[in-house]
Each structure stands twice: as structure tokens, then as C-alpha cells.
Amino acid sequence: MSHIKYDDVSVQQRNIEKAQRSSNPLKEIPESQSFAEFSHNGLNFALQCKLKSDLDPKVIKWAFKLAERNVGNYFKTCKEGWQPKIKQNDLNKNWARYLIAVDKSTKKNVAYTMFRFDLDYGSSVLYCYEMQVESEYQRKGLGAFMMKALEHIVQHFKMEKLVLTVLKNNPDAVKFYHRLGYKKDETSPDDEDYEILSKVFIETSNQSANVLEALS
């Protein structure tokens, strides 16, 4: 982990703006060729990084259906429940970016992450809103590979953190992120059905102060 300290918000903002100008941030990282494809036990996947505006609406529909299959039941036991219209609206946000894994043999989409670059409680972050993998492709290292790709994007654009949310009642997902080194973020609420996890890549000396100021 880098020990550069970003105490100047203007520096963070410039890094965010640079990342936001990129139509394909995965292609810009030095390791882009290493993350273009992933193979496991005879299965071969290609990774595509696209803006929401460049995606066929059918892909967004698939992303929603996959989220519904994977986590719909978990949401149904939470106080706010499963809200399909809100989920559909979230997936269709103009700022949304998608990293999609395609099975090269079938040409079918099998996994995706949805993310954005943002200033979150005073920190420059890549915020991962979704990580969904088709059930038959889970536990093959694909999800971890896609998260690693996001981490390299974070490092390339000098973001401070990669941040994500996970439902507390989804133990497999919680274990998955913990295994990858994600820890409870200082912004995570105590009284919600979800928790915020993060991995810090660039430290700041005033992160806690930024959070307290934003919450006050």
C-alpha cells in the first residue's frame, strides 16, 4: 500500500476528474493485457469495461435479473425489502460504469461489476455498487479476478480507496470480501442491514476528520 498522503482535496478532485474522463479505464492501466482475459479449468472469459451509455439495454436487463436471482431473497429479509424499480433505476444511472465478464465459448455475459469514481466523505474512491456472478460460474476465481482489476484501476488513477457495500445477512459475500482484504470502513453505519467495506490504497492524515465533518 502506498504511503503518499493526500491532504489537499483539490488533488483528489483532479484524480477523480481524470478517471471520469476515461471511457475505458481498464484499458489505460499498465496491466491491461493481463486483465483482458481470465481462464480457469478450461473456461475462458473476456473482460469488457464500458459506460452505461454504450451498453445495449438488454445487458442492463440481464444485470437486473442476475441481481434479482443472486440477492433478491437477501433484500426481502431486510427492513427496506427488495425494491425492483429502485434497483433498475440504479443500474441505469448515467454515471454507471460496467466491468463485464463474457464466456468466450458461449459469448454470454456471466458476471459484472457496476462502479463509479467519486469523492466520498472527503476521500477519492472507486465505489463498487454491484458484483454479481452467474451461479454456475461462482467459486471459480472470476469474482476475485474482477475485483483485482478494479483495484488496479484504483491504483492507476491514484484513488484513495475502493469502497463497497454488502448485506450483513449474506455471509458468503461478506467472507468473499474479507478474504480479499476488505475491512469495515469508518463510514459504515451500525444500525443498518448492510455494512460498508473498503480497502485503502493511499493514506490521508485527516480521513477521520473528513468523515466526522461530512457526518456533522
Locate predicted features.
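Alpha-helical elements of Rossmann-like donor-binding domains used by nucleotide-donor carbohydrate transfer enzymes
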Residues: 62-66, 145, 149, 196
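Short acidic/polar micro-motifs centered on Gly/Asp/Asn
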Residues: 130, 151, 164-166
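Active-site acidic-Proline motif in GNAT/NAT acetyltransferases
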Residues: 134-136, 140, 168-169
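Conserved acetyl-CoA-binding loop-helix of GNAT-fold acetyltransferases
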Residues: 139-152, 179
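Short coil/turn segments at alpha/beta junctions that flank glycine-rich nucleotide-binding fingerprints
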Residues: 140, 157-160
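C-terminal "cap" of GNAT-fold acetyltransferases
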Residues: 160-163, 167-175, 179-216
